[in-house]
């Protein structure tokens, strides 16, 4: 399977991009904001046969860091995606958005409806306040009930931060999103 990585310069920021597969493109939008696309690879790369999956680390996340003074709101994220679409030479996008990426896909479709061919939402972030409050309460409950606190405590005492900072960072991130994938 073909895998390519590059950095795209759009709207004054450098965005890391990874492409997997060959065929018609599907843009995969990761959660966050402020996260990276890597955690989606084990699940989403199985969709690559017959298409090109385009992942990119959104402004301010992963391998696309920005200085503090650079805005990273939803409008900037939407316009970054529009600038990438133009740079890629695509008339319309097929988008698969996970969590915050699903909400970003919805916002993009609202702002640029003529530029979206297909939009798949995977466990997208809540759109209205009441749903967000309910989600946050359930998420906090899963965080406590699933033994994640004990796992975090073990990690803090493991010495991994000093011996392998990158592995420590990855594990901290895994534990920060683990309650999203809790088995009810």
Question: PLM features: what roles do these ranges have?
Answer:
Residues 1-6:
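Short, hydrophobic/aromatic-rich segments at coil-to-beta transitions
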Residues 146, 150-184:
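Alpha/beta-hydrolase
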Residues 65-78, 125:
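Catalytic nucleophile-loop/oxyanion-hole region of alpha/beta-hydrolase
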Residues 118-161:
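Flexible "cap/lid" loop of the alpha/beta hydrolase fold
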Residues 41-44, 68-71, 109-110, 133-137:
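Short, glycine/charged-enriched secondary-structure capping and boundary segments
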Residues 7-70, 84-86:
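Conserved HGGG/HGGXW glycine-rich cap/lid loop of the alpha/beta-hydrolase fold
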Residues 75-93:
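Conserved acidic catalytic loop of the alpha/beta-hydrolase fold
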Residues 91-135:
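Conserved hydrolase catalytic core segment
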């Amino acid at each position: 399977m073909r895998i390519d990585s590059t950095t795209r310069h759009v709207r004054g920021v450098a965005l890391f991009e990874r492409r997997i597969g060959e065929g018609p493109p599907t843009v995969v939008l990761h959660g966050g904001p402020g996260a990276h696309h890597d955690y989606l690879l084990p699940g989403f790369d199985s969709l690559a046969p017959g298409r090109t999956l385009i992942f990119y680390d959104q402004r301010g996340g992963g391998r696309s860091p920005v200085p503090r003074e650079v805005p990273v709101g939803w409008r900037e994220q939407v316009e970054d995606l529009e600038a990438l679409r133009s740079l890629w030479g695509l008339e319309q996008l097929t988008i698969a958005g996970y969590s915050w990426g699903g909400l970003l896909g919805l916002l993009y479709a609202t702002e640029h409806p003529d530029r979206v061919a297909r939009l798949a939402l995977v466990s997208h972030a809540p759109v209205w306040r009441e749903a967000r409050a309910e989600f946050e309460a359930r998420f906090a409950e899963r965080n406590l009930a699933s033994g994640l606190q004990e796992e975090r405590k073990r990690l803090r005492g493991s010495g991994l931060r000093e011996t392998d900072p990158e592995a420590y960072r990855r594990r901290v991130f895994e534990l920060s999103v683990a309650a999203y994938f809790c088995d009810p």
